[in-house]
């Protein structure tokens, strides 16, 4: 049975489909959520399950402010600040109260966990190791929360950065060489000059 395109909600037939983010799209429906540029499967960033072009849109919306992820440049699209920080002076806390709080018991594990839980009150589970992901150690990609070291290429296990990797069937891959080897045109390293053919049978005869 043909699936539904998540962009236009119409049936996607085999001849017109591309697969990305674990879903089937019409080729011209796989567009950046911000600028509407047509994207290629695995050649785009992702945030909350939606596709974005790497530059400038993903870097503008979700990258470190003023830094274009993956290259030099600045992509700041924010309104200029109209007000200076209204700080009239340092806030002083009596030393006695601080000491009293320390003697009553310093915050430990439970309070830390409660500060990093999700809206449901429960930490999310990492799709790689199936363990809880707390705020201080999480990165978000493919609509899921991962431990930083767990967001790795499915093929070579290289650690990846959120939005800086390819995707196939909901799994993360590095762009080069792994995604190009597995899912790109045979003999072509997608996105750069070179040849990356890793057939299962290296001793097999070369097809003309």
Swiss-Prot record:
Modified residues (Phosphoserine): 104
InterPro entries linked to this entry: Znf_LIM
Tissue: Expressed more abundantly in liver and kidney of females than that of males. Equally expressed in brain, lung and heart.
Pfam families: LIM
Domain LIM zinc-binding: 5-57, 126-178
Domain of life per record: Eukaryota
GO BP field: hemopoiesis; positive regulation of cell population proliferation
SUPFAM superfamilies: Glucocorticoid receptor-like (DNA-binding domain) (SSF57716)
Keyword Disulfide bond: no
Record keywords: Acetylation, LIM domain, Metal-binding, Phosphoprotein, Repeat, Zinc
Transmembrane segments: none
Residues the record lists as N6-acetyllysine modifications: 23, 138, 144
A Gene Ontology molecular function term of the record: metal ion binding
One cellular-component annotation, GO: cell cortex
UniProt-listed SMART domains: LIM
Quaternary structure annotation from Swiss-Prot or TrEMBL: Interacts with TGFB1I1.
PANTHER family: CYSTEINE-RICH PROTEIN 2, CYSTEINE-RICH PROTEIN CRIP FAMILY MEMBER
Protein name per Swiss-Prot or TrEMBL: Cysteine-rich protein 2
Phylogenetic lineage: Eukaryota, Metazoa, Chordata, Craniata, Vertebrata
């Amino acid at each position: 049975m043909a699936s539904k395109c998540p962009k236009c909600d119409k049936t996607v037939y085999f001849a017109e489909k591309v697969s990305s983010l674990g879903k089937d799209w019409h080729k011209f429906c796989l567009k950046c959520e911000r600028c509407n540029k047509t994207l290629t499967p695995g050649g785009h960033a992702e945030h909350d399950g939606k596709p974005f072009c790497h530059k400038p849109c993903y870097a503008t919306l979700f990258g470190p402010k003023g830094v274009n992820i993956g290259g030099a440049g600045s992509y700041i699209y924010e309104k200029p600040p109209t007000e200076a920080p209204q700080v009239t002076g340092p806030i002083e806390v009596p030393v006695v109260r601080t000491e009293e709080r320390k003697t009553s018991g310093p915050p430990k594990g439970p309070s830390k966990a409660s500060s990093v839980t999700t809206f449901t009150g429960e930490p999310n589970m990492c799709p790689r190791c199936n363990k809880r992901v707390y705020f201080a150690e999480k990165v978000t990609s493919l609509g899921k929360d991962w431990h930083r070291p767990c967001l790795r290429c499915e093929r070579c296990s290289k650690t990846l950065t959120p939005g800086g990797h390819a995707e196939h069937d909901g799994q993360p891959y590095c762009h080069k060489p792994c995604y190009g080897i597995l899912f790109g045109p045979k003999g072509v390293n997608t996105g750069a000059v070179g040849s990356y053919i890793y057939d299962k049978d290296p001793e097999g005869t070369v097809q003309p």
